[in-house]
A protein has these predicted regions:
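N-terminal low-structure segments adjacent to metalloprotease catalytic domains
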Residues: 1-90, 97
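Short, flexible coil/linker segments at or flanking structured domains
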Residues: 2, 133, 163-165
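Charged, low-complexity, helix/coiled-coil-prone segments
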Residues: 24, 50-69, 123-137, 173-183, ...
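Short, charge-rich amphipathic segments
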Residues: 38-62, 113-125, 160-166, 183
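Generic detector of ordered, mature protein regions
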Residues: 65, 72, 83, 130, ...
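Low-complexity, highly charged intrinsically disordered N-terminal segments
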Residues: 67-151
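Active-site scaffold of zinc-dependent metalloenzymes
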Residues: 100-113, 139-189, 193-200
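Metalloprotease/metallohydrolase-associated module, dominated by Zn2+-dependent proteases
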Residues: 204-205
């Protein structure tokens, strides 16, 4: 009896947490009107929200099954179903955390520098399009840069399944810049942009 009471309390807590991370927007990450020139595009937020909504649908599906079956299922089965819901909540937390970290820096003093990095990356893609206009299949979301600890810049390519996101694919390229390398003209940054170009051109090895 006490175990069932505990499980019911656990399920109520899961339900309360389940929809807290289903959407992200400019205001929620602290981007003010004066920050908009440096902010990621609405399409970047749209892609992020599509990913969050997809995860949320899976959370709601598993949660609905749990709520409908827990009272008549074995303790072992209920614990397993709770774990499956918690895994999806963790997936939402990780995805939301990545988007919040990347987007939220556009409301800080690093925003102009990060926007400059973005502009350089876009120029690299533009140069390819000018030479071969049909080489990319339709529009592509540009790379978005953010600051993080590390020794050198690094990239997370479009569509790559990330351990950080429990295997969720990356919806757009993300380039990490170390805190002490906020100089957009550094050549090593172009190296990371080139990795993304290789991937988007289908020649990544």
């Amino acid at each position: 009896m006490e175990t069932r009471v505990f499980l019911k309390t656990k399920i109520v807590a899961l339900k309360a947490r389940a929809r807290r991370l289903a959407q992200i927007d400019y205001a929620s990450v602290g981007i003010r009107p004066q920050d908009l020139p440096y902010a990621p595009s609405p399409n970047h937020f749209r892609a992020a929200n599509q990913r969050l909504r997809k995860i949320d649908r899976e959370i709601q599906r598993r949660l609905a099954h749990l709520q409908a079956s827990w009272s008549n299922s074995s303790i072992h089965r209920v614990l397993l179903d709770i774990a499956l819901v918690e895994r999806e909540v963790d997936r939402a937390r990780r995805a939301f955390g990545l988007f919040f970290e990347v987007f939220g820096q556009r409301g800080t003093t690093f925003a102009p520098v990060l926007a400059a990095y973005d502009a350089i990356a876009v120029d690299c893609y533009t140069a390819i399009r000018q030479v071969a206009p049909q080489i990319f299949r339709g529009p592509l979301l540009k790379p978005v840069c953010y600051m993080e600890h590390g020794f050198s810049p690094a990239t997370m390519r479009r569509g790559v399944q990330l351990n950080r996101l429990l295997g969720e694919p990356n919806p757009f390229p993300v380039i990490r810049i170390p805190w002490d390398r906020d100089n957009p003209w550094q050549a090593v940054f172009l190296h990371e942009v080139a990795h993304n170009l290789q991937a988007d051109l289908g020649i990544w090895q």
